[in-house]
Amino acid sequence: MGHGRRATDSLTPVRNLDDILKAYDVRGTYPDQLDEDLAHQVGGAFVRALGIATRDGGAGAVVIAHDMRPSGPSLVASFAEGVRGQGVDVILIGLASTDGLYFASGRLNLPGAMFTASHNPAQYNGIKLCKAGAAPVGQDSGLRDIRALIDAGVPAYDGPLGEVREQDMLADYAAFLRELVDVSGSRHLRIVVDAGNGM
């Protein structure tokens, strides 16, 4: 990831976002409505809108995950470059459910981005954003500001790039889920699980 775009100012501002900026997420078909350039700009605008601390001004970071959609890894990489270009570190937790990303945001106390389009078909993808502690980002809590920054062109950042690291949160998340239910007194059951494409 170290050889990506330096900053967001090299991109043409994206217009006509009305169809993909929903109440609580960004969602559209890939690559017609949501592509790598837009993901890059959303990453930079997310950092700016939330005022996430840069490497030379604190210890800010964004945790990012994606579901099983084929476009996920490429969109995540571009979003991460947008975040890095604004001087903020990136923590990649890889393939995860939305609840898994929210758990990571809460456990690490960091803002997060989940690449998913929920129930929509595979040609769709989207970005659910949250503040530190898994507080949702909606139109009235950041999305409108992100839209304004993208429309105007995300300002360039001249400080050092953020760094990227991977972190496995699955074991911690599984332990957290097991703590929610006391199975010590449960009778023997046979359970069938539909893993939903692994998610």
Predicted features along the sequence, with ranges:
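Short, glycine-/Ser/Thr-/acidic-enriched flexible segments
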Residues: R27, R69, N120, A134-A135, ...
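An N-terminal, well-structured beta->alpha segment
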Residues: R5, D9-F79, G85-Q86, E166-L189
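Gly/Ser/Thr-rich beta-alpha loop segments that engage phosphate groups in nucleotides
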Residues: R27-Y30, A96, K128, G198
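Gly/Ser/Thr-enriched, mixed-charge loops and adjacent short helices
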Residues: N125-M199
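Ferredoxin-reductase
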Residues: R55-A132
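Active-site flanking residues adjacent to catalytic metal/cofactor-binding acidic residues
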Residues: Y24, H66, T116, V193-G196
